[in-house]
Regions:
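Acidic, glycine-anchored loop motifs typical of Ca2+
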Residues: 53-63
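Predominantly extracellular/secreted and cell-surface proteins with exposed
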Residues: 72-160
Length: 208
């Protein structure tokens, strides 16, 4: 689903960007070091949320921040990810109730800089690593191992400006929920019941 297509993202179908055209390891690290030099403290995480009072605004947000590893190891850290916000998109009521009680999480994201990057903007694909939860729920009050898997945007690259003022943003989605080693069919987007993913956008917070 293209939830935030109005943002200034670059299409993944950029002309001339083929699977054979990739950055060398040295080029990749050079871009990553340039990205790490920036400060990304005033960020926000936007996510899909049902809003019956305004059908044109099916989005909510939480403040966040980000740090990018200076070691060129393709990792960035996202703070205050709203795990509990996923509850309304889960069809299993017991699991949803357990998810709703979860605190915000600090999560690692893996990213890879794309070859259409320039000296001013690094374009990249990014995705959070899986979130592992140990939850107790259900009528039998049993403990369950729950894993949340994400997928990067299939339509738009993320971006990071390499000059001040720094701008960074990328899209991703909750893609699968596994419980006790089994893939489930529990994702049911509350804003569109036909959608089996939940969209997120991580970007700079807009000034009011």
């Amino acid at each position: 689903a293209v939830l935030f297509a109005a943002m200034s993202f670059t299409s993944c179908n950029t002309d001339g960007d083929s699977g054979m055209n990739i950055l060398t390891l040295e080029q990749q690290k050079s871009f990553q070091h340039a990205m790490a030099a920036g400060s990304y403290n005033n960020m926000t995480i936007l996510y899909e949320k049902k809003n019956d009072a305004n059908v044109k605004n099916q989005v909510d947000s939480v403040p966040s921040s980000c740090s990018i590893s200076m070691y060129g190891d393709s990792t960035m850290t996202m703070y205050k990810f709203p795990v509990a916000a996923l509850a309304e998109h889960i069809s299993n009521k017991d699991l949803a109730a357990a998810i709703a009680k979860e605190d915000q999480r600090t999560i690692k994201c893996k990213y890879n800089v794309m070859p259409n990057s320039t000296s001013e903007v690094a374009y990249f694909i990014a995705c959070p690593e899986a979130i592992n939860l140990n939850l107790t729920y259900g009528t039998d009050n049993k403990s369950h191992k729950v894993v949340l898997y994400f997928i990067p945007s299939q339509m738009y690259y993320g971006y990071c400006s390499l000059k001040e003022p720094r701008q960074l943003g990328f899209q991703f989605a909750l893609y699968q929920i596994w419980v006790d080693g089994y893939q489930t069919n529990f994702i049911q987007n509350s804003t569109n019941s036909a959608n089996t993913t939940v969209g997120f956008l991580f970007r700079n917070a807009w000034k009011k």
